[in-house]
């Protein structure tokens, strides 16, 4: 896996304009839709249990995000996820805040038990709690703590039979056998709500067009991080509001050549 072939996946996304079905949270819906549109994907936000199975069946990817968790959304996620599995549509899961409350943790463990996942994406604390490993968490945005992030990612990939993505200062992508670190991004991403949730949906767009899900995830993370770096270089002195707008611009403007030039990945296994 080299930077040139990784960089070409973004071109494939823009050529294919994949439909990404998001069952996401109320905080990030608008930002997620605009981010996917800027990238070149086609977002749809369909939540009603009466239509989610049908919508998921025709999507390029299904993204399940439990940020603002309610029983109605859990039911919709299960219906959509099982339909996606039946129709060979890749499912991505963002277990937002797993470990913060008993209900949230229960749902975060139940969904992977019921639905086959192509990718699970979260911070270290969230992924650790999904697989019942101890890790500190406070609220839904905690990701720091003590532990080996690569080992947690590999364990999650093995136990859930999926590609595990753990994001933080360094991002980890693994299927349990291949493990890659991505070192792109900028700290100001943490000052804009929804950047992690949007990232999961962006990975969904890449997974929709690249069936090697490790490669797709690495490409998405590298693209996202490079776009953030470029946006920050133009706006960081102005603050997160200016960054958010410029970041959407860079999701549209960052090219495969930019990824080749600025991408920072390391294959560690």
From Swiss-Prot:
Q: Which HAMAP family match?
A: Thz_kinase
UniProt record, GO biological process = thiamine biosynthetic process; thiamine diphosphate biosynthetic process
**Coiled-coil features, chain-numbered ranges:** none
Q: What is this protein called?
A: Hydroxyethylthiazole kinase
Known cofactor(s): Mg(2+)
Q: Which Pfam families match?
A: HK
Q: Where does ATP bind?
A: 121, 167
Q: Which reaction does it catalyse?
A: 5-(2-hydroxyethyl)-4-methylthiazole + ATP = 4-methyl-5-(2-phosphooxyethyl)-thiazole + ADP + H(+)
Q: Give yes or no: UniProt keyword ATP-binding.
A: yes
Q: Give the family, as the similarity comment puts it.
A: Belongs to the Thz kinase family.
Top class in the EC scheme = transferase
Q: Which gene encodes it?
A: thiM
SUPFAM superfamilies, alphabetized: Ribokinase-like
Which pathway is recorded for this entry?
A: Cofactor biosynthesis; thiamine diphosphate biosynthesis; 4-methyl-5-(2-phosphoethyl)-thiazole from 5-(2-hydroxyethyl)-4-methylthiazole: step 1/1
């Amino acid at each position: 896996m080299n930077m040139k072939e990784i960089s070409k996946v973004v071109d494939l996304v823009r050529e294919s304009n994949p439909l990404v079905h998001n069952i996401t949270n109320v905080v990030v819906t608008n930002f997620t839709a605009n981010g996917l549109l800027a990238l070149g994907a086609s977002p749809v936000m369909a939540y009603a249990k009466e239509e989610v199975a049908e919508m998921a069946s025709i999507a390029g990817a299904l993204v399940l995000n439990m940020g603002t968790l309610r029983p109605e959304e859990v039911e919709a996620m299960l219906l959509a996820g099982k339909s996606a599995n039946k129709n060979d549509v890749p499912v991505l899961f963002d277990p937002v805040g797993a470990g913060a409350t008993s209900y949230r943790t229960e749902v975060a463990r139940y969904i992977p038990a019921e639905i086959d996942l192509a990718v699970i994406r979260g911070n270290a604390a969230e992924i650790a709690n999904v697989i019942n490993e101890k890790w500190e968490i406070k609220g839904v945005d905690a990701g720091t703590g003590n532990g080996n992030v690569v080992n947690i990612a590999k364990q999650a990939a093995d136990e859930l039979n999926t590609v595990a993505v753990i994001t933080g200062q360094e991002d980890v992508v693994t299927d349990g056998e291949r493990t890659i670190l991505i070192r792109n991004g900028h700290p100001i991403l943490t000052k804009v709500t929804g950047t992690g949730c949007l990232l999961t949906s962006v990975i969904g767009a890449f997974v929709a067009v690249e069936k090697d899900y490790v490669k797709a995830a690495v490409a998405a993370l590298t693209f996202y991080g490079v776009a953030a770096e470029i946006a920050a270089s133009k706006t960081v002195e102005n603050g997160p509001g200016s960054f958010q707008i410029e970041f959407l611009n860079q999701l549209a403007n960052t090219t495969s050549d930019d990824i080749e030039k600025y991408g920072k990945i390391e294959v560690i296994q």
